[in-house]
């Protein structure tokens, strides 16, 4: 009985359960043909191209203001070959402006131009030469002059001897020194640009032969010593010792007076003869 009850499953011929997918039916990808896929890809590419064109047009309208639209200049990529040429042209333009405003100018190009290098002294001149040249100019109540202005010095033949007239850049005549002209001509003859004539030099040397130049005077050592600072300052009542200096000056003064007296006697004797 039990054997008859128990039968194999095959005898009942039951339908086998089918294995269904875990995904719902709606989410399953539908089958698409190759033609439809190509059409969809073409549509997507066209949409992307349209979006890129719209973005470029929007950037151009925002970046280009009224100045750029009026000039018609289109912004270029820094990596383009025209960018270095523009930089070179800009640098040449700037250097030209600098040379035009700050460089040396010619009066023919600009009548109001002033050469700042015109008043410069040559490097070959020593400090002593420049000092004495300025001293002469200040004594003549005129500004320091350069080599070109020094060439305009001239001795008037009709005027008295020793009166030197000077012409500046504009032809202005500076008043003469008068009696001091001979002293400056004799004392600064080696530093003055226009050399005096030989006869005039001999006459000046003969006239001032009794005067001992400062470089040839025998001054005492105390003359060349710098003063020592006194701790008491102005309260010190002691006077410095100038005895050796006064002695040397008195000796030189006596010799000069004696030479002047002998010259005066000789002059009177010649006048009497």
UniProtKB/Swiss-Prot annotation:
Keywords: Developmental protein
Ranges in coiled-coil conformation: none
A Gene Ontology BP annotation from the UniProt entry: digestive tract morphogenesis
Pfam family, one: TEADIR3
Bias type Acidic residues, positions: 28-56
Disordered: annotated span: 18-84, 253-273
Claim: Transcription regulation is one of the keywords in the record: no
Ranges of Polar residues composition bias in the record: 67-83
Tissue occurrence: Specifically expressed in the stomach, pancreas and intestine. In gastrointestinal tissue, expression is primarily restricted to gastric G cells and duodenal enteroendocrine cells (EECs).
Gene ablation phenotype (knockout): Mice were born at the expected Mendelian frequency and do not show gross phenotypes at birth. within the first days of life, mice however display reduced size, low body weight and substantially decreased survival. Examination of fecal pellets and internal organs reveal abnormal digestive-tract function, as well as changes in the composition of the intestinal microbiome. Defects are caused by impaired expression of gastrointestinal peptide hormones and development of enteroendocrine cells (EECs).
Keyword Protein biosynthesis part of the UniProt annotation: no
Role, per record: Plays a critical role in intestinal function by promoting the development of enteroendocrine cells (EECs) of the gastrointestinal tract and pancreas. It is thereby required for normal enteroendocrine peptide hormone secretion.
Descriptive protein name: Protein PERCC1
């Amino acid at each position: 009985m039990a054997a008859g009850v128990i039968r194999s499953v095959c005898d009942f011929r039951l339908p086998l359960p089918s294995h269904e997918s875990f995904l719902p039916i709606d989410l399953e990808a539908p089958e698409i043909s190759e033609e439809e896929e190509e059409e969809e890809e073409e549509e997507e590419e066209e949409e992307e191209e349209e979006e890129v064109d719209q973005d470029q047009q929007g950037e151009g309208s925002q970046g280009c203001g009224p100045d750029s639209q009026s000039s018609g200049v289109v912004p270029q990529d820094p990596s383009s070959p025209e960018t270095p040429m523009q930089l070179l042209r800009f640098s040449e333009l700037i250097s030209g402006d600098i040379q035009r405003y700050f460089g040396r100018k010619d009066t023919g190009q600009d009548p109001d131009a002033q050469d700042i290098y015109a008043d410069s002294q040559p490097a070959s001149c020593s400090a002593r030469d420049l000092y004495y040249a300025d001293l002469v100019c200040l004594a003549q109540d005129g500004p320091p002059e350069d080599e070109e202005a020094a060439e305009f010095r001239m001795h008037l033949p009709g005027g008295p001897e020793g009166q030197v007239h000077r012409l500046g850049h504009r032809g202005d005549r500076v008043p003469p020194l008068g009696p001091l002209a001979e002293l400056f001509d004799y004392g600064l003859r080696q530093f003055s640009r226009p050399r005096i004539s030989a006869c005039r030099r001999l006459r000046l040397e003969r006239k001032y032969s009794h005067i001992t130049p400062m470089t040839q005077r025998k001054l005492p050592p105390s003359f060349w010593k710098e003063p020592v600072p006194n701790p008491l300052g102005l309260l010190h009542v002691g006077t410095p010792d100038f005895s050796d200096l006064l002695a040397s000056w008195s000796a030189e003064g006596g010799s000069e007076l004696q030479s002047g007296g002998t010259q005066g006697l000789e002059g009177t004797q010649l006048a009497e003869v």
